[in-house]
């Protein structure tokens, strides 16, 4: 009997908040994978932060056993994927491990940007797509319209799409039937050399790195010597098994078509990269599975401990997070204003926020983070070129021939009423209009090319507020383009605060400088001497604000009396303030570093 016939590998894709994790919970419950006692909300979102924000950050997997009415038993491997645009690569690898994908669409909201993006990823991997319409128990649900929309926009048959409610558990059985009926059984040859895809990996302090794998060909069991194809390192498999979401060891190993995990005393997640191919050391496969890309950081930011003595602890915290997150990179850097810290690279803004929160939460450290910046390519007049991740390292303008910045292709889905507002926002952010298509009478998808550094700060928040939260955004890196950029420095009391430096387009330097100076004026507390806040490009000051000094009323004790007496006291005070200003240092509160981001 060929057991592959009874295996189905599928994942669930959806836009944020369309009910992906809740549907996964119901499927686990329906197939009796977990007892009622173990059942909690969002079982597959294991991180505290995931539960709190209601988002999936790491991919998870579970093995469900489904008995059909005719007595046949099927093994369904569910691979949960993150829905956020920062983790697109992780999603694409999870999808490559499946043969089918359930496309969850919210019956009240319809198709949104991420739905489309993830759906196209699934189509790129030749997956069978099973549409499921969720939240039909809500009064505002419009299942029939949405079916039509799925057919029109994505072009897949949706007439028989199950109408479910993951919250109440309505029609979940239909989803399981659809998976068995529509998703093809895995193919693969058990006797061929081993070929398996790592679609996720994490570090366990007892077992080393646990690799989630999908075996394409061959088989793997404890004792097999395996080789990872991107690094050519060889390990011996210690344990193989499946997920019930918890790890359950299986002595007999995994064979073609199955999804499970292996451990092989690997010390670092970087050695078992997502997307890599595992093969036998003795009998390697000819070629690796396609699509492997090392994770490339898109956004950089400085992280510093508030208390300089905690530098080593911060280093340890980042190292621990890095063990579990191959996409995080960091290197030590020093700042005149903030002391010793690290320059960290992230996949995107959400990834950055999550790492920062985890450092604060899991390691109880107080940190200061600087404004995020993207990677610029700088070419100097002597022909040398380099990647710039930190604005402070920019050479003087006279030595630069030209600079290039990353540009993304953004697709924004919005109700037609807000088309004008969205286009205005994109134009304002130096966007180049490409095209727009109507999805239906009331919704439109707009494509723009926008420089990444315009998106990094607060594009998403502004987009949401301009469209009352209805618009959704998805973007992918298009490449680098030349543009006129300058470095904006902020001087406090005549000293350059390096942590506030940023790179801005020349045309926006004045308004950005003006806005930052005004913002800092509100945030920096008054000192005993006056503090000038200046924004400068090169040696030219383009904006100035002054935080007035606190002063004692030195004339209070003079009642009447001669004017020269008063003058003498005022002069004396002025002298003192001047001396203070030369010696004094300006305290910059933590909010100042963050407020620079929110300037618009």
From Swiss-Prot:
* Protein name (database record): Elongation factor 4
GO cellular component terms attached to this protein's record: plasma membrane
Q: Where in the cell is it found?
A: Cell membrane
* Reaction it catalyzes: GTP + H2O = GDP + phosphate + H(+)
* GO BP term (any one): positive regulation of translation
Q: By its UniProt entry, which HAMAP family does this protein fall under?
A: LepA
What InterPro entries does the annotation carry? EF-4 (IPR006297), EFG_III/V (IPR035647), EFG_V-like (IPR000640), EFTu-like_2 (IPR004161), G_TR_CS (IPR031157), LepA_C_sf (IPR038363), LepA_CTD (IPR013842), LepA_IV (IPR035654)
Its placement in the membrane is given as: Peripheral membrane protein
Q: Name one GO molecular function term.
A: ribosome binding
Which of this chain's residues are annotated to bind GTP? 17-22, 134-137
Q: What does this protein do?
A: Required for accurate and efficient protein synthesis under certain stress conditions. May act as a fidelity factor of the translation reaction, by catalyzing a one-codon backward translocation of tRNAs on improperly translocated ribosomes. Back-translocation proceeds from a post-translocation (POST) complex to a pre-translocation (PRE) complex, thus giving elongation factor G a second chance to translocate the tRNAs correctly. Binds to ribosomes in a GTP-dependent manner.
Please state the gene responsible for encoding this protein: lepA
- Give the enzyme's EC designation: 3.6.5.n1
Q: Which family does it belong to?
A: Belongs to the TRAFAC class translation factor GTPase superfamily. Classic translation factor GTPase family. LepA subfamily.
Residues in domain tr-type G? 5-187
Q: Which spans are transmembrane here?
A: none
What is the superkingdom listed in this entry's lineage? Bacteria
Keywords for the protein's UniProt record, in alphabetical order: Cell membrane, GTP-binding, Hydrolase, Membrane, Nucleotide-binding, Protein biosynthesis
Q: Which NCBIfam families match?
A: lepA (TIGR01393), small_GTP (TIGR00231)
Write down the top EC class of this protein: hydrolase
């Amino acid at each position: 009997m060929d057991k592959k016939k009874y295996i189905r590998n599928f994942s669930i894709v959806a836009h944020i908040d369309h009910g992906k994790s809740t549907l996964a919970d119901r499927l686990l419950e329906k197939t009796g994978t977990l007892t009622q006692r173990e059942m909690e909300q969002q079982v597959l979102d294991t991180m505290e932060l995931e539960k709190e924000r209601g988002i999936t950050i790491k991919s998870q997997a579970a093995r469900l056993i489904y008995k059909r009415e005719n007595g046949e038993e099927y093994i369904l491997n569910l691979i949960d994927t993150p829905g956020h645009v920062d983790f697109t690569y992780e999603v694409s690898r999870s999808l490559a491990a499946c043969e089918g994908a359930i496309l969850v669409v919210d019956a009240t909201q319809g198709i949104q940007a991420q739905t489309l993006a993830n759906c196209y990823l699934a189509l790129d991997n030749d997956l069978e797509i099973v549409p499921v319409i969720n939240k039909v128990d809500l009064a505002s649900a419009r299942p029939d319209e949405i079916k039509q929309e799925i057919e029109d926009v994505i072009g897949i048959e949706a007439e028989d799409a199950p109408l479910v409610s993951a919250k109440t558990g309505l029609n979940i059985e239909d989803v399981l039937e659809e998976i068995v009926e529509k998703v093809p059984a895995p193919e693969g040859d058990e006797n061929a050399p081993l070929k398996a895809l790592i679609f996720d990996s994490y570090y366990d302090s007892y077992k080393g790195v646990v690799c989630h794998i999908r075996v394409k060909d061959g088989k793997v069991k404890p004792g097999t010597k395996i080789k990872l194809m991107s690094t050519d390192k060889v390990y011996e498999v210690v344990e193989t098994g499946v997920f019930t979401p918890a790890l359950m060891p299986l002595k007999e190993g995994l064979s073609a078509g199955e999804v499970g995990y292996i451990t092989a005393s690997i010390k670092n997640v970087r050695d078992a990269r997502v997307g890599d191919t595992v093969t036998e050391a003795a009998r390697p496969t000819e070629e690796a599975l396609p699509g492997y890309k090392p994770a490339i950081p898109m956004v950089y930011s400085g992280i510093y401990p508030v208390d300089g003595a905690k530098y080593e602890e911060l280093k340890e915290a980042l190292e621990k997070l890095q063990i579990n997150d191959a996409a995080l990179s960091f290197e030590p850097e020093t700042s005149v204003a903030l002391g010793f810290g690290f320059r960290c690279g992230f996949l995107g803004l959400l990834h950055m926020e999550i790492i920062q929160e985890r450092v604060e939460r899991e390691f109880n450290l107080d940190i200061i983070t600087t404004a995020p910046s993207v990677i610029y390519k700088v070419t100097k007049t002597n022909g040398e070129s380099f990647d710039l991740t930190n604005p402070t390292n920019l050479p003087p303008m006279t030595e630069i021939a030209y600079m290039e910045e990353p540009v993304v292709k953004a697709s924004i889905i919005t109700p037609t009423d807000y088309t004008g507002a969205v286009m205005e926002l994109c134009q304002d952010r130096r966007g180049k209009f490409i095209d727009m298509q109507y999805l239906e009478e009331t919704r439109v998808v707009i494509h723009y090319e926008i420089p990444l550094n315009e998106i990094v700060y607060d594009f998403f928040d502004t987009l949401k507020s301009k469209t009352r939260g209805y618009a959704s955004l998805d973007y992918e890196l298009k490449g680098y383009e030349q543009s006129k950029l300058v470095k904006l420095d902020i001087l406090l009391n005549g000293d350059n605060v390096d942590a506030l430096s940023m790179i801005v387009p020349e045309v926006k330097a004045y308004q950005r400088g003006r806005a930052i100076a005004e913002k800092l004026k509100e945030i920096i507390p008054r000192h005993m001497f006056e503090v000038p806040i200046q924004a400068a490009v090169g040696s030219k000051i383009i904006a100035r604000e002054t935080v007035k000094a606190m002063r004692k009323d030195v004339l209070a004790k003079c009642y009447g009396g001669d004017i020269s007496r008063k003058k003498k006291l005022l002069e004396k005070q002025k002298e003192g303030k001047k001396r203070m200003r030369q010696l004094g240092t300006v305290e910059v509160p933590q909010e100042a570093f963050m407020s620079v981001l929110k300037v618009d």
